[in-house]
């Protein structure tokens, strides 16, 4: 048998049928749905008189457009568009009999946090959702990626997806990370080096000592942003860290099934002589706390750097840099650590887990946010929120001047009430810094939770190592 990558193994195990041109019918193990990309799909089933093929493998949760302020359990307190979408998901989930976590359920939260938290995401699975950051689940050694609304309907109806296989790409982070450097810094550094198109046409497997040393929360941060690097999906091979995280979760295997599952999961790794179409290697010790300066995730530099000039680039990137600098209101040559911030957002499917909140709380404990600063912490799920309150993190944030919100996608995207105003500049733990992503003419700098917390305290982008 020829050597295989982890991606090869999962793909081959799920191919139900293959055409002569390489197009495959892929079986899907888990289908996650939310309120924004599913209404038309459910309506399509209804119009065709179809049922959900595997409701026991379909998980629904409202997250993108739900308010994160108190009173949201009352539909009359929601903005009209939020109310309509949440009500539609509620109706569809109950009518079609899928697993459902409504806003009144403490288990509700961002779908890519709820899935792993509840044990729905397991190694070796195929996972899809009508959301690009489905790649998050690849941290478990699952093949996970986003799909469009028409594909959502197809998976609901058949539990399969028509796909062509991507190429294999390996990103290895060697050695150890320096103190103060996090998973978010790793993935921003990777994208800064490879560009947002570096992974186009590939599934990326992240490996190396620095990746192995990460917790599951950190690994989810890495895979979450595989899509920002252009990849179809991101993968990290499962190991004892993975098994320990999954064990005992509500929908994880139990008893003899657990032992059998772990024995199989231990075979999910890339063989030594497997073929890679592209390899990128970065030394962990070379990675520093990282921030974005422009309007693309690839506009990432160490916090110790200065804002680049358009002349530092070539080709079409010259004009792109000029436009980004104009939009962001920055001057070439200024220190990144001199950029003043007026808003801080800690949350999202990238960095809304308990470990992220602990890291931010460690920075702000005993301190106050800068006068005039608007800062909010939005836990990724109701269970994360409850745990943070039990650990005293919520009080640390509130004492420092942060808003302590309910679970949801919040300010990651300008789809719900949590938005930037024109010209506001935000240090954000989310995943995209596009023009208008957080609000009309809002300016976004992507950072780790610790770096976001540091910015809240100092009022500017700050090297957290100095605090």
Swiss-Prot record:
Residues annotated to bind [4Fe-4S] cluster: 349, 409, 412
Cofactor: [4Fe-4S] cluster
Pathway involvement of the protein, from the record: Amino-acid biosynthesis; L-leucine biosynthesis; L-leucine from 3-methyl-2-oxobutanoate: step 2/4
GO molecular function, one term: 4 iron, 4 sulfur cluster binding
Alphabetized SUPFAM superfamilies for the sequence: Aconitase iron-sulfur domain
GO-annotated biological processes: L-leucine biosynthetic process
Cofactor comment text: Binds 1 [4Fe-4S] cluster per subunit.
Catalytic reaction equation(s): (2R,3S)-3-isopropylmalate = (2S)-2-isopropylmalate
Keywords noted in UniProt: 4Fe-4S, Amino-acid biosynthesis, Branched-chain amino acid biosynthesis, Iron, Iron-sulfur, Leucine biosynthesis, Lyase, Metal-binding
Keyword Hydrolase: no
Subunit description: Heterodimer of LeuC and LeuD.
Entries under NCBIfam families matching the protein: leuC (TIGR00170), PRK05478.1 (NF004016), PRK12466.1 (NF009116)
PANTHER family: 3-ISOPROPYLMALATE DEHYDRATASE (PTHR43822:SF9), HOMOACONITASE, MITOCHONDRIAL-RELATED (PTHR43822)
HAMAP family for this protein: LeuC_type1
Role according to the record: Catalyzes the isomerization between 2-isopropylmalate and 3-isopropylmalate, via the formation of 2-isopropylmaleate.
Protein name as catalogued: 3-isopropylmalate dehydratase large subunit
Lineage: Bacteria, Pseudomonadati, Pseudomonadota, Alphaproteobacteria, Rhodobacterales
